[in-house]
Each structure stands twice: as structure tokens, then as C-alpha cells.
Amino acid sequence: MTTVRTRIAPSPTGDPHVGTAYIALFNYCFAKQHGGEFILRIEDTDQLRSTRESEQQIFDALRWLGIDWSEGPDVGGPHGPYRQSERGDIYQKYAQQLVDMGHAFPCFCTAEELDQMRAEQQAKGETPRYDGRALLLSKEEVQRRLDAGEPHVIRMKVPTEGVCVVPDMLRGEVEIPWDRMDMQVLMKTDGLPTYFLANVVDDHLMGITHVLRGEEWLPSAPKLILLYEYFGWDKPQLCYMPLLRNPDKSKLSKRKNPTSVTFYERMGFMPEAMLNYLGRMGWSMPDEREKFSLQEMVDNFDLSRVSLGGPIFDIEKLSWLNGQWLRDLPVEEFASRLKTWALNPDYMMKIAPHVQGRVETFSQVAPLAGFFFAGGVTPDVKLFEHKKLSPEQVRQVMQLILWKLESLRQWEKERIMGCIQAVVEHLELKLRDAMPLMFAAITGQANSVSVTDAMEILGPDLTRFRLRQALDLLGGVSKKENKEWEKLLGSIA
């Protein structure tokens, strides 16, 4: 009997996302319920954005939640390497195999040619897609250009007529027309694979039997299925999970909700409660009880109990459930966990250098630095009263800084300050006009330790969370203001 093998394959390009944890949980439970194995693979082919720091944060977040893996980059295994960036030769081999079989081809089109192609198609009211012009090149010309070392990608051929039947474990058979599919790039000019080729090759070579992934990948499923057919491989069983949603039903995003697992750990949520809540996202226990452990979820796991309605990720409901878990702890364990959370040595070492020179007794630490240990802060609205800026301008400055911080890839003090300075300079203000607002929003106080140091230590999600709280305290941003300020954002360097 074939051993069930599932996997999670996150990209290490930022803080570990609750959506990653959600999909990891369901893959883990499915594998364990069937006596199988759960694998962790790292999709780090985006060399510009991928970092080992983000990779480690993924490991730490999943282990904090209680999700572990039998094979992965940090523990090894018989199917390694488990980082896609270390599997380049493997992808090159299989891409060339597709070319040799006539299922893929080199494409030498430049970015400018592709942009012009799309513009012409849009002008005609057509769906932008690759027009296949490289297929018209003779074998001799292709070889000449390859021999000359001309930059190129490898694209897959796709049918232009008919439909692809996608067998989904939740929805049954889903028909998707082939004319919606583009001639997907499989290998980029830098010699690294795109998601599609790497995904199929890795899942096959690692013996993955079932793939549970987010439903946002369902429209592109025909490309994956076609690749399995081209290679002559058995494809894994496919399951497209409903996406997590904000309370307004929009896709869960950091613009509306904190999305980092690290944020919830720092806020003092219990990992058991977090897993419990993620387990209730579109799934329920047979007896419908709300509070259950990871092992209880594994023991009772059945995909037939997954609901296709978009599950709502609501922090208030998560907080309520966390309260149930907290109150059920023996008081000794409650005290022990509180100590572990509040007096985390690594976190304390980040804070101590900024506090030590500002206090004369330990009792002065709490008033000065207590905001480091809080989730949100409750600043007095008077702290946002400004001699120079109107209330609307105060909100504008804070909103623009928040948006700039949302696009920040590397969370470092200098880059944080760069975001603030960019907004201030564009609005022809001084730093002294904006920094008191940041102090109030981030620390809840008129002054404290360096606010940019504090933002770096607190991290991106907690910083953005507090800025959003401050904006709500000041009345929020109207739809009209949001539209106008977003236009302004585009012109800020």
C-alpha cells in the first residue's frame, strides 16, 4: 500500500503567513490521519526576495504551532535537497527533456517585445498572452541563437481548444477551457525554474501523493496536469482549499489584518488556540465542538467536512477561543507560560540596550518600555494634536507612512526611517513634524526609546497593527481620502 505523503512548500520572502500555517495544518492532519508523512520544502527560486532569515522564521513559526515534518531542509531526508535553489541541475535536466520531446521550446523574446505584444492584444480587445512566435523559428536559427548564448526562457506548449478536467477532492471534476492558459514559462533567463516546473518535478521525485493547496491555484491547475502528462508521470490527488478571508469577505491581506504567525505569538496567543482556530477555518469536528487539540483534529480529520465557503479569519473570535484555552490551564502552567512569553531572553536582549541607560531603578522599566510587551497601545488622542498639521494632514501622514511600510521587504531601522523620510520630504514637511505622531502611535507615549528602534524590535505586523489602531482612533480614512492618497503614494520615491 502506498504511503500517503503531503507537503507544504512556502516561499521565504517575508514573515510566516497564517495562510501558510493553515495549509500546512490541513496537509499535516491529512497525512497523519492516514499514517503518512508530512514534508517541508522551501520554494526559494525568487533570489531577490528569498532570505535564510525568512526561512528560519517559517521553521520557528510552524514548530511553535506544533507542526513538525519528517523531511526538510533542516532535518534532511532521502529526497533532498529540499531547497529549490539547490536543485537547479535537476530542473535543467527535466526542462531539456520537455524540449527534446517537443512539449516545450526556447523563447528569445525580450521584455520590450512581450510588452508590445500585450499592448497590441489589449488594443484589439484580446486577452494578453504569448502568441507563440518563437515556434515559427527554424531549428537552425534556434540552435544558432542558443550557441551564441542569447538570453532565453523555456516555455511549455499548451492546447488552444477544448477543456481540461481537473479532479478536485473537494469539488469533483472542474472543467477549465484550454484557451485560458498561456504558454507558461518553465525556466527563466537566470536558469531557475518557475513555480510550475519546480512544483511538478519536486512533487514527483519526492513521492508526494496528495497536494492540498489554496484555491487561488485552481485556475492554473491545467498547466500542472499537462506537465504530468508530458512527463508520463502519475499525478498526485489534488485538493484546492478555500482561502482565508477578512471579515469583509476580501482575501486575507496584511493591509486589513495582521497576517504573520509571529505577530500572534508576540501578542501572547497560545499555539494550541491558534491551531484550533485555523482548524475551524472551513472544517468542523463531527460533534461540532469548538475547542479541540491538534491530536483530536488528526484523529477525526476527514476532507468531506471541509466547507467551500470562504472561512473568515476574525481576531476577536480567535481571542475568545484563546481565552478558553488560557482559562483551562492549571494555574502553575499559566504562570509558567506567562513567564516564558513575557521574559523571553532573546526578546529581552533586543530591548535591554535601549532601556538600560534611561533608568535608575528596575521599577522604571515598565513605564518606559511596557509597550514592548503589549499587543496594542491606547494613546491619548491629544498626543496627535499638531501645531502645524490639520487633523486631516495628521491622518494623511500616518496613512502614507503605513502604506510605505507595508511594501518594505527588509525590516531594518534604516529602511524604516527611509520610508518615513520619503513621505515627509514628498509632503514638504520636516521629520520633527512626523516623529511625534509615530511615537504616539507605536509607544502610546509622548516619548520613550527611539521610535525607529522600537519599530524594528516590534516587527512589521505589530508596527502596522498599531498604526492602523491609531488611524481608527482618529476617525479612520474615508473612501475619498483613500483614493486620493493612494494616487499620491504612487509618486513618493
UniProtKB/Swiss-Prot annotation:
Main location: cytoplasm
Superkingdom field: Bacteria
Keyword Lyase: no
Residues the record lists as binding ATP: 254
Broad EC category: ligase
Reaction catalyzed: tRNA(Glu) + L-glutamate + ATP = L-glutamyl-tRNA(Glu) + AMP + diphosphate
Localization per record: Cytoplasm
GO cellular component: cytosol
Biological role: Catalyzes the attachment of glutamate to tRNA(Glu) in a two-step reaction: glutamate is first activated by ATP to form Glu-AMP and then transferred to the acceptor end of tRNA(Glu).
Family stated for the protein in its record: Belongs to the class-I aminoacyl-tRNA synthetase family. Glutamate--tRNA ligase type 1 subfamily.
Protein name: Glutamate--tRNA ligase
Organism: Pseudomonas syringae pv. syringae (strain B728a)
